[in-house]
Regions:
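Active-site-proximal alpha/beta segments of enzymes that process anionic O-linked groups
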Residues: 1-42, 46, 53-219, 226-241, ...
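Metal-dependent active-site segment of extracytoplasmic phospho-/sulfohydrolases and closely related
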Residues: 253-292, 330, 336
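Extracellular recognition modules
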Residues: 473-479
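Membrane-interface soluble catalytic domains
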Residues: 140, 157-166, 309-434, 468, ...
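Aromatic sugar-binding surface patches on proteins
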Residues: 450-463
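Surface-exposed, short loops/turns at beta-strand junctions within beta-sandwich domains
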Residues: 461-473
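Substrate-binding rim/cap in mid-to-C-terminal beta-strand-loop elements of soluble/periplasmic
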Residues: 105-118, 293-335
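Solvent-exposed serine/threonine-rich low-complexity stretches and specific carbohydrate-binding patches
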Residues: 441-453
Length: 516
């Protein structure tokens, strides 16, 4: 069984009782900022590399590993712009701040310059009728400037609010898993990893961009890779097995795919008037891939700007977050930004300090961890709307945390705990945990209330060899005042037909592996 830690859970409840005006005070509203486009507008290709960190480079190049698993991307950043200053041999990248450490949060940070603080589950924004109607994002700005915009990915785009956000803020066209099936790009019923693999995504992107460029209209083509998603990624059949571990080979192959795609772009007639931005969407959430790195190493996402319309004014190493990608992307297109700030982001090509440089990383993180009434007002979320309640009741959201509490190797039992239960009112009168094994067999166990710390514990029998399974699905059923109010398949809904249990103790993970 595979396990991983949840990010930002431990401090969430505590911080929701403390408010901060940091975002309100520092936010620069793009709708009230003068933006001047060049006479000839540049095209944009934005590549979100799933879970891609600069950490995957070797230590000699500013990474955290003994061997460089992204050598081509390392060279690409060093040859272009990653805001590392005069020392091009050391990679630089953006910090992922609180409420930006998953895909939709990462995209929102890079295009709106804000953390995705919401009053609903992090991946349930698709249940809302609107997505932060009070903001102006990158897509809005480019749409108003006459850009044709497409977002492509190898999974269903609707998950996590991506479709809602990009439709509302930019009127994007979507080329996703459903589009690929409907248009014969993949066969009906074809399903690999999260939908279809990156090899097919990049081939689709080449055709899409060729067609968009032929219209003469400036374009923004944004794509999100998926092969490198945790847990352990998807290794294409054509990939080289250079390293001893699977995930390193996945990143090494993605490194090859992305840079080959960039090389293809450079041969196209539209390239001279096109800027390419490559960024990790967030640090990897894989359970064990980064466990042996130096604990003092500060992980950052991979960042690279290629063929920018402008050069840096202050050629020193910058300290920045993914918020700064918002104005920096526009600046790379040759857009002049009055004040060089948008959202919480700063134009890194300018000499203006980022908020991280101004306040320090810890101070900024601390403020962003607190509840912001300003963000609640901007979000436009309604946790009482009928669609959201129906989603809670029938489909499930990450409305609680389920994790492995303990494992008894002699009794062949595991204790699963349900904690941090989200509900809108009433009293909890029943909690159970249902485990579905890959063979379809199920166990449903009533959880007992541990009053000392508020969690609910359920002891499940795994003597049938369940620990040998690669993954098992876990549902927590929570009844509020005798009505079935919540059902949560703890891990993200789009994790295919399986989910995995997060574990907060690597020792337990090792125990299970050794017992299987």
């Amino acid at each position: 069984t595979t396990f991983w830690n949840h990010l930002d859970v431990g401090t969430y409840v505590e911080n929701q009782t403390t408010t901060s005006d940091f975002i309100k005070d520092e936010y620069v509203d793009p709708s009230k900022t003068q933006l001047t486009f060049p006479e000839k507008k540049r095209n944009l290709i934005y590549i979100y590399c799933e879970s891609m960190e600069m950490s995957f480079a070797d230590q000699a190049n500013g990474g955290a590993r003994d061997e460089n698993v992204i050598p081509r991307l390392t060279a690409l950043a060093e040859e272009n712009e990653d805001f590392s200053g005069t020392d091009n041999s050391q990679l630089n990248g953006g910090y992922s701040m609180p409420s930006t450490t998953w895909t939709m949060g990462g995209i929102f940070a890079a295009t709106a310059g804000l953390p995705l603080q919401t009053d609903v589950g992090r991946n349930t924004m698709s249940t809302q009728s609107t997505f932060f109607p009070g903001i102006t994002a990158l897509g809005d700005i480019l749409e108003n400037a006459g850009y044709n915009q497409t977002f492509s990915c190898g999974s269903p785009v609707s998950f996590g609010g991506r479709e809602l956000y990009l439709q509302e803020h930019g009127n994007y066209t979507f080329h996703d898993y459903e589009y690929a099936q409907a248009n014969g790009i993949i066969p009906r019923g074809y399903y690999v990893w999260w939908g279809f693999e990156d090899a097919r995504l990049f081939e689709m992107a080449k055709n899409d961009i060729t067609n968009m460029a032929s219209s003469g209209q400036p374009f923004n083509y944004t794509l999100l890779t998926v092969d490198t998603h945790f847990e352990d990624g998807y290794l294409d059949s054509s990939a080289e097995n250079k390293f001893n571990d699977h995930y390193s080979n996945v990143f090494f192959h993605s490194d090859k795919q992305v840079t080959e795609f960039v090389d293809w772009c450079k041969t196209q007639p539209w390239y001279d008037n096109t800027t390419i931005v490559i960024s990790g969407d967030h640090p990897t959430m894989d359970s064990d891939y980064m466990e042996n790195i130096d604990p003092e190493y500060q992980r950052r996402v991979y960042t690279c700007y290629i063929n920018s319309a402008v050069s840096v004014e202050n050629n020193t190493k910058r300290t920045f977050t993914t918020f700064d990608n918002f104005p920096t992307t526009l600046a790379a297109l040759g857009v002049q930004i009055d004040g060089d700030r948008l959202g919480l982001g700063t134009n890194l090509f300018s000499s203006k300090q980022t908020l991280t440089e101004q306040y320090g990383l810890d101070k900024e993180k601390g403020e962003l961890n607190k509840k912001s009434t300003f963000m609640s007002e901007l979000s436009g979320n309604d946790v009482s709307n009928e669609e959201f309640q129906e989603y809670l009741n029938k489909e499930g959201i990450r409305s609680s945390v389920v994790y492995l509490q303990s494992y008894d190797s002699e009794a062949k039992t595991a204790t699963l705990s349900v904690d941090d239960i989200f509900y809108t009112g009433g009293n909890i009168d029943y909690v159970s945990v249902e485990v579905t094994h890959p063979d379809g067999s199920r166990q449903k166990v009533k959880a007992t209330h541990n009053k000392s710390d508020g969690r609910y514990d359920a002891v499940i029998d795994i003597s049938n060899g369940g620990i040998e399974y690669q993954t098992i699905s876990v549902d927590a059923h929570i009844r509020i005042d005798n009505s079935d109010a919540l059902k949560t398949q703890n891990i993200y809904q789009y994790s295919g037909n399986l989910a995995v249990i997060p574990c907060e103790d690597n020792l337990l993970q090792q125990t299970l592996h050794s017992a299987s």
